UniProtKB/Swiss-Prot annotation:
Function field: Prevents the cell division inhibition by proteins MinC and MinD at internal division sites while permitting inhibition at polar sites. This ensures cell division at the proper site by restricting the formation of a division septum at the midpoint of the long axis of the cell.
Gene designation per UniProt: minE
Cysteine disulfide links: none
Gene Ontology BP annotations: cell division; regulation of division septum assembly
Alphabetic keyword roster: Cell cycle, Cell division
Family named by the database record: Belongs to the MinE family.
Protein name: Cell division topological specificity factor
Organism: Bordetella avium (strain 197N)
Length: 90
């Protein structure tokens, strides 16, 4: 009988289903708390490190912003690039 129940799947108790649903709701609410996620400062630091390999920039010249609108999230990254020496002399 256990093999048959394995194939057909066991029906979960209503308590375990309710617990799973509450965990999903809590995780969703926790992820929406605050204006900016925890990873934004680290993302900004990593962007500075990568871009600094190729171009000399000031860490303050990179701005990372997350905007939420209903179900849409927009990650905006603004990087102020220094003028090249040829452009600066013109």
């Amino acid at each position: 009988m256990s093999f048959l129940s394995f194939l057909l799947g066991q029906k979960k108790s209503s308590a375990s289903v309710a617990k799973e649903r509450l965990q999903i709701i809590l995780a969703h609410e926790r992820s929406g708390r605050g204006d900016s996620p925890d990873y934004l400062p680290q993302l900004q630091q990593e962007l500075v490190a990568v871009i600094s390999k190729y171009v000399k920039i000031n860490p303050d010249d990179i701005k990372v912003h997350l905007e939420r609108q209903d179900t849409l999230e927009v990650l905006e990254v603004k990087i102020e690039m220094p003028q090249s020496e040829t452009q600066a002399s013109v």
